[in-house]
């Protein structure tokens, strides 16, 4: 049953097949601090102190993340506290919203899965990144679908460039 006023949950999956080192790609997607460098809707992602109840994994596992978007004159921004809740190098990383202000918050989940076709000895196929975003709140409006879709398309070459620059330097 939907909450009153809720349009619907948002579930988006995007894939990227790219000729980049799998380990270097994983290094980028496992660290939310890199996202502002290649994903424009993430305007800021700063590490924050992990707190009891975060259930974070993998070192600095919590970030304060600012999301922003604009369609015509309409602007939206959102600050989230995200925690890396799963990290299985070099295959899977998952981030979940974890606020500690005593209020009830909408669910945000971002996961990334990497498939390295060369890991089993095959040649010629490119590594594939599959990212999934789930938003369980009621503030999503249809025009944000277009914004997100456009941003995903623009981010693909930026991510490849960013990974290649980091692995070369």
Task: Tell me what each language-model feature is.
Residues 47-99, 162-166:
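Glycine-rich portal/gate segments that line the openings of hydrophobic small-molecule binding cavities
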């Amino acid at each position: 049953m939907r909450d009153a006023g809720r349009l619907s949950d948002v579930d988006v999956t995007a894939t990227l097949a790219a000729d980049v080192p799998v380990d270097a790609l994983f290094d980028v997607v496992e660290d939310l601090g890199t996202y502002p460098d290649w994903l424009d809707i993430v305007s800021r992602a700063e590490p924050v102190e992990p707190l009891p109840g975060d259930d974070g994994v993998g070192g600095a596992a919590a970030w304060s993340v600012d999301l922003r978007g604009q369609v015509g004159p309409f602007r939206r921004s959102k600050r989230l506290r995200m925690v890396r809740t799963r990290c299985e190098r070099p295959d899977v990383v998952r981030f979940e919203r974890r606020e500690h202000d005593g209020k009830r918050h909408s669910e945000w989940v971002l996961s990334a899965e990497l498939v390295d076709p060369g890991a089993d000895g095959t040649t010629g196929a490119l590594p594939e990144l599959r990212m999934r975003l789930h938003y369980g709140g009621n503030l999503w409006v249809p025009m944000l679908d277009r914004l997100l879709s456009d941003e995903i398309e623009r981010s693909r070459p930026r991510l490849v460039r960013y990974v290649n620059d980091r692995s070369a330097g």
